[in-house]
Every structure is written in structure tokens, then in C-alpha cells.
Amino acid sequence: MKTSMQRKLDQLSTRLAELNDLLSRENVTADLDQYRKLTREHAELGPVVEQYALWRQSRSDETAAQELLGDLSMRDFAEDEIRSARESMSRLETELQKMLLPKDPNDERNIFLEIRAGTGGDESALFAGDLLRMYLRFAERQRWQVEMMSESASDLGGYKEVIVRIAGQGAYSRLKFESGGHRVQRVPATETQGRIHTSACTVAVMPEADEIGEVEINPADLRIDTFRASGAGGQHINKTDSAVRVTHIPTGIVVECQDDRSQHKNKDRALKVLAARIKDKQYHEQHAKEAATRKSLIGSGDRSERIRTYNFPQGRMTDHRINLTLYRLEALMDGDLDELISALVSEHQAELLASLGDAD
């Protein structure tokens, strides 16, 4: 283990001991905000220090076994112990490296998931509906809460555009790698010749701002229009101007919400989505220079990048960023995404580890 890493772990061990002392004091709950901050830090450091203690125990076991090598009657036993201790240290060091990776500050946030139909007309809109169902089934498996924010249905079913809010522990950390272009290859229901068509949708995963005030929005920069909500085919579904369109003039970002009968609620939802879109835009602009110097295949979140192909005739899904192909498309479309997401997270961690190695 590198000296710098060991020094960092020693510091964390000392800090955990300090936290144990602070949390054992009688007046610890006098300041609830401070108490929550301390318990959160304790929960983060505990597993790291525990792993480090196991690594130190393995190192101690190796040292003890080294001392037995001079005894011929104990040599075989000592060599086995040394081998076992080194394997354990190597495994624990890898785990510790992952645990020490820089945390994405957005990882524990709720998200807005936006799906837009792209090339392919009605078939693309139908696929947008299939993608939405896939993500909703995955959210259901995680026991996350889902709220429809905005939808623009197509005439034959599916969506031209749909935005949902997904709330739950680690929502952004699990779904942030879904941003990008999703391509589908299949025979559409309307196809009489049995030909395979290719269509595409774009997915954007945006972390929710804790408060709208977290993103600076000058009311003077907003244009707010109201209009009658309409369903598929353009028919008006109520007689009041309850639908709201909010335009952020400096960025040109436009958000429409018409799902609720209350104009006030639609405006509130639109402002929340707008705040998330502005925050997302700022985040990508901030990381543009970094992406230019070190191309990250996984975490770029580039909307124009084709990240995945869903081939229905072959029953396969291919993620082009990590060259992973899974031949169980039906289960994946039903929200069984754990294997795919875990592979993306692991690859992203490997990229981060490699970049830290380059920095050393």
C-alpha cells in the first residue's frame, strides 16, 4: 500500500475515534443539525476504518508468519500463512481504494428522468414508452417513489417526451450513466413486410436541486405562458388555462407541465424541472474542460452519444461504452438492470482509479 494512502487511512481512523467521543457526550443532541452531520460522517467513515483494521491485521499476520520461516518444521505452514495474508491484503487494498474514491456530491440526490423520442417517428415514441416502463419497473424494485412531471403522448401510444421525478436513496448514483442515445432495432407493429426498423430516443438524468434557491434564477429572466392542456392527438382535455410553459430566456430552456388540473401545481413542477435542467447544464459546462483532457467513456453523459442498442430480434442489449452484451433483453426491459448498472459503476470506478494512479 502506498504511504500516501496509508497516511490518509490513519487520519480517518483518528477522526472516527474523535467522532466516537463526540457522539458519546450527554449534550450531543443539543444541536440537532450538528448531530446529524456527525452521525452522517460516522456512518461514512465506519466501513472504511473497519476495512483498514482488517488490512492491518493481515499485515500483522504476514509479519508473524515471516518470523516462523527460520523454523524448518514450521516453514510450510508459514509460507501458506504468508500467501493467505498477502492475498487478503491485496483484496482489501483494492476495496479500500474504491472506498476512498472521490464522492460525486449528487449521488444521493433524487432525479428527474427525461426521455425524448428521436429519429423513427411513431416507433421512436413507442420505444420511449418502453424505456419509461423499464425505468419505472427498476425504480419499483428499489422501492423508490415515482411522480409524473410532464408528458407529451403520441397518437399511437408512447411519448414524444416524458419527464418523471424519481425519489429514493442513491437514485442518481444508480441511474446517472443512463444519459445518452438509446437505439432500438425491431419490427414495428405497423410494419407489414416484416422489416427491421431502427429508431432512437435520448435519455437525460438530472439530479434534483435540494431547493429551487440552490440554482440562481432571476424572475426577470423567466417568461411564463399558460394554455389549455391537451392530450394525444391535440384534443383539449379541460376548459381552463391550467397548463404552464416556462421559458428561461438566457439559456433558452423551455419546460411545459400540464398533468395537473391546478395551474399553481403545474407552475411549481415546471420550476423544479427548470432548476434541475439549469443545474445540469452548469454541471456539464463545468466538466467540459476536464472531459476534453481526459475522455471518460462512462461518465460523460453526452446526450448525443449513442450509448446502447436494444436488438429485439436477437434478444440482446449492447452497451457500447463498455462493450457489454447481454442476451436477456426481456428481463432487462422489465427493469432487471442490476447486472448492467453494476458493470457500468465498476468500469467508472476503474477509470477513476486509473486517473488517480496517473496523478500519483
Swiss-Prot record:
Post-translational modification note: Methylated by PrmC. Methylation increases the termination efficiency of RF1.
Cellular localisation: Cytoplasm
Gene: prfA
Pfam families reported for this sequence: PCRF, RF-1
Protein name as annotated: Peptide chain release factor 1
One GO cellular component, as annotated: cytoplasm
Entries under InterPro entries matching the protein: PCRF, Pep_chain_release_fac_I, Pep_chain_release_fac_I_sf, Prokaryotic/Mito_RF, RF-1
General function of this protein: Peptide chain release factor 1 directs the termination of translation in response to the peptide chain termination codons UAG and UAA.
GO molecular function: translation release factor activity, codon specific
Residue(s) carrying N5-methylglutamine: Q235
Family: Belongs to the prokaryotic/mitochondrial release factor family.
Assigned keywords, A-Z: Cytoplasm, Methylation, Protein biosynthesis
Cytoplasm is among the record's keywords: yes
Chief place of localization: cytoplasm
HAMAP family attached to this UniProt entry: Rel_fac_1
